[in-house]
Amino acid sequence: MSQAGMNEGHALVQVLNGTYNPSGKLTDTWAIDYKDYPASATISNNDGNSLEEFYQDDIFVGYRYFDTFGKKVAYEFGYGLSYTDFEIHTDSVEADEDQIKVSATVTNTGTADGKEVVEVYFSAPDGELDKPYQELAGYKKVEVEAGKSQKVEITFDTDDMARLSLIHISEP
């Protein structure tokens, strides 16, 4: 449990004794080794410079770096555990000029009620600009009783997939 606050002990007991089914997901990627982070060599005086920090991650921050460059990780972005199991089935993907809508069904295949996060990613085609392998476009958390299913829709704007450079290159 990370940054759980002053009630961390009470929350941990409820998770461990099964009175609460956890559903949180990691908001960052956890590398296997600190040196696996691209900025590790130049951050926090690791390069002998405590006055200036130079980030060279560019657009490849967090999961975008690890996914794009195929780095193995200890725990990926969005990782989380539960006392139940879920299956997510993509029902449809609809797109027009302005938006993309993904419809899915989340089925709780376990024996405990629980919550699951459905994540939608997109991959942009290659072009002149650097792009991560994939980017999170949207997500939604749904509560599903054991043995039941829940429909979910996630919509995002097509503009969210655009790239813009400072040398006036724009790619849809």
Language-model-derived ranges and their functions:
Residues 102, 118, 152-154:
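Hydrophobic residues positioned within well-ordered beta-strands of beta-sheet architectures
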Residues 73, 114-116, 130, 162-164:
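Short acidic, gly/pro-rich beta-turn/loop elements at beta-sheet edges
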Residues 112-128, 136:
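Short acidic, flexible loop segments centered on an aromatic residue
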Residues 1-115, 141:
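Secreted, periplasmic, or luminal enzymes acting at the cell surface/secretory milieu
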Residues 165-172:
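Residue-level detector of conserved catalytic or cofactor/ligand-binding positions
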